[in-house]
Each structure stands twice: as structure tokens, then as C-alpha cells.
Amino acid sequence: MKMFKQDCEKAGIKVDSCISLLMPESYVGLPFMDVDKKENELRKKEQAKRELQDFADTIMKNVHGTERIHIGNWPRTNTRFLGNIFLNHIITDKHFRLNEEKCIKCGRCIKSCPVANMSADSNGFPQWLHTGSCLSCFACYHHCPTRAIEFGMRTKGKGQYYYTKNEK
């Protein structure tokens, strides 16, 4: 929390409280990372569902000074050292590739991009804009119904995850 507050203060943002939810794993951009197995995914979603109501009550009651965050192993190392490697070398759209034979031009990948870093080319195929705004969130990858999007060789054989409201 201390590092988070410091970073926010540098950006001119005052942090009064901090609450986090542990959600299913969706980052698949490194060789040793994949989506959670179904039982872990369901367990995390059930836990988040229980915590979310409590968090909503805290927010609605305007409670200040709340700190309920999940801190992983080696937070300083992960945040400062590995975080800088991610920011400078891994968070990019240059590794994304489209398999045009699999693509059905549905546009789900384009619509799912939270930073509007994709558009359709003149043939209707999705393309990355290479503007430096890509978050490497993999929303495009996870929302593709035909698995036409790949991140180099790093996503070969890996799972997909995205939340659907009625998913059990």
C-alpha cells in the first residue's frame, strides 16, 4: 500500500482507501503463465463475490482509511524490478499476430480493447495500431471465439478466460 500511495501522490492523486479483489488469472504472455484451472477460477470468483458486497458497503458508507489488499510474494521486487521490465519490454502489441485463416472478422477483439488500440483493416481483419497504448491485457486474445489471435509463440496451447454474467 505504501508504494501504491507514493506512486499515486507523484501523479497528484490522493489515496484515502484501497481495496482489491483476487480475480482469475488471465495473463498468458509469459511461457510459465496460463489461465487458472476451472476449480481455481470458480473458487476465486466465489470469494470475490463474497468480498464485493462488503467492499460496496464500505464505499457507500464513505468509510475512510480502509486497506484490504492482496499482497503477493515479494511485492517490492515484483513492483519495482519486474514492473519496470514489464513496462519497458513486455507491455506491447508488437508480439500479437492474427491468423487470417481462423479469423471470422467478428470484431469482438476490437470491441474488447479497453484502450481502442485495434481497428479493422480495409479487408475487415483486425489490426493493432502500434500507438504505444497497448496494455497487454490480452482482452483481444481472450475474446476471440476462433483463437485467431496469438502472442508470438507464448500463447500456443494456452487457455482463454473472460467473464460472462451467467457463467457457473
Annotate the PLM regions.
Residues M1-I85:
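FMN-binding flavodoxin-like domain, especially the glycine-rich phosphate-binding loop
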Residues C18, K158-Q160:
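Generic secondary-structure boundary/loop-capping signal
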Residues E41, T92, N123:
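Generic anion/oxyanion-binding catalytic loop in active/binding sites
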Residues N73-C106, I110-K111:
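A mid-sequence, solvent-exposed acidic-amphipathic segment
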Residues L98, R108-W128, A139-K156:
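Iron-sulfur cluster-binding cysteine motifs and their immediate structural context
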Residues T131:
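Short hydrophobic "strand-cap" motifs at the C-terminus of beta-strands
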Residues Y161-N166:
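Active-site-proximal loop/hinge segments that shape catalytic or ion-binding/gating pockets
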